[in-house]
């Protein structure tokens, strides 16, 4: 287990959480793990919070592929990325040390805005209007013009991200073993003059989605990358593809993806 000895904790500090993390660090050290203060030195990155904190941990630490991410929920929380509760951290340490875990590999999407440096998303990218006016987007798949969307916005999600914002927009929950990404509409405008598909659709991992923002007053839409807004202005084109970057997480052997979906929603 030498390659898994360095552990880093990512969390939002406050007085109560500082005390809990101090105790977690003590337990880690007592079990032979080396607590590090720089995430780049870690082979295990632990986020403490809900799914949102987990997404931030992955983004803030650079979508590393050479380490294991794991999520710990705070009291009373539930999540799809978090297998452990802050009150049973001892069980997590025992599972890590005795390899009573399974490694999951979550795909990411690559988002390129205006042809510039790409961003990566584990959950989804969304684009929304910032004014009281529909946003107009030409939607192309592999260079083929599929539709012209008018409405509040669009969401492009990974399979694991399908349980987030996309689901609230009537998107499907996608099995993470399916290699592809989902495109969902947010409040599309459909009448005798304007038509869109009116439903979510799923693209194969080899497809390229191109979104062209028509400049009709919506020059500064909100772009959200997972749970963080992008400061980019005057967005004209957004290209989305599946990426080869894979985020490795661990799960308890008796806690499947669909068990977590049921526990979260049903």
Swiss-Prot record:
GO molecular function: ATP binding; metal ion binding; NAD binding; NAD+ kinase activity
Active site: residue positions: 51 (proton acceptor)
Membrane-spanning segments: none
GO cellular component terms, A-Z: cytoplasm
Residues that coordinate or bind NAD(+): 51-52, 123-124, 150, 152, 163-168, 187
Keyword terms: ATP-binding, Cytoplasm, Kinase, NAD, NADP, Nucleotide-binding, Transferase
Reaction catalysed by this enzyme: NAD(+) + ATP = ADP + NADP(+) + H(+)
EC number(s) given by UniProt: 2.7.1.23
Lineage: superkingdom: Bacteria
Record-level GO BP terms: NAD metabolic process; NADP biosynthetic process
Principal EC category: transferase
Subcellular location: Cytoplasm
Chief location category: cytoplasm
Matches recorded under InterPro entries: ATP-NAD_kinase_N, ATP-NAD_kinase_PpnK-typ_C, NAD/diacylglycerol_kinase_sf, NADK
Bridged cysteine pairs (disulfide): none
Cofactor: a divalent metal cation
Family label: Belongs to the NAD kinase family.
Role according to the record: Involved in the regulation of the intracellular balance of NAD and NADP, and is a key enzyme in the biosynthesis of NADP. Catalyzes specifically the phosphorylation on 2'-hydroxyl of the adenosine moiety of NAD to yield NADP.
Protein name: NAD kinase 2
Highest classification ranks of the organism: Bacteria, Bacillati, Bacillota, Bacilli, Bacillales
């Amino acid at each position: 287990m030498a390659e898994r000895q360095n552990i880093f904790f990512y969390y939002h500090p406050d007085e109560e959480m500082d005390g809990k993390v101090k105790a977690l660090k003590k337990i880690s050290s007592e079990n032979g793990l080396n607590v590090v203060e720089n995430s780049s030195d870690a082979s295990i990155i632990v986020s403490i919070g809900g799914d949102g904190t987990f997404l931030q941990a992955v983004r803030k630490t650079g979508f590393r592929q050479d380490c294991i991410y794991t999520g710990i929920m705070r009291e009373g929380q539930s999540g799809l990325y978090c297998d452990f509760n802050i009150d049973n951290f001892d069980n997590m340490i025992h599972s890590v040390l005795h390899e009573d875990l399974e490694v999951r590999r979550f795909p990411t999407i690559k988002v390129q805005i205006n042809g510039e440096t790409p961003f990566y998303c584990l959950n989804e990218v969304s684009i929304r209007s910032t004014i009281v006016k529909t946003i107009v987007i030409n939607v192309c798949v592999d260079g083929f013009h599929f539709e012209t969307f008018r409405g509040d916005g669009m969401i492009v999600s990974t399979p694991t991200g399908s349980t987030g914002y996309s689901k609230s927009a009537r998107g499907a929950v996608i099995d993470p073993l399916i290699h592809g990404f989902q495109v969902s509409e947010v409040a599309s405008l459909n009448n005798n003059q304007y038509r869109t598909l009116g439903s979510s659709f799923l693209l194969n991992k080899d497809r390229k989605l191109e979104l062209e923002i028509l400049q009709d007053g919506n020059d500064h839409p909100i772009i959200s990358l997972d749970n963080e807004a992008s400061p980019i202005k005057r967005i004209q084109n957004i290209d989305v593809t599946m990426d080869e970057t894979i985020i490795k997480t661990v799960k308890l052997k008796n806690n499947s993806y669909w068990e977590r979906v049921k526990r979260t929603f049903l």
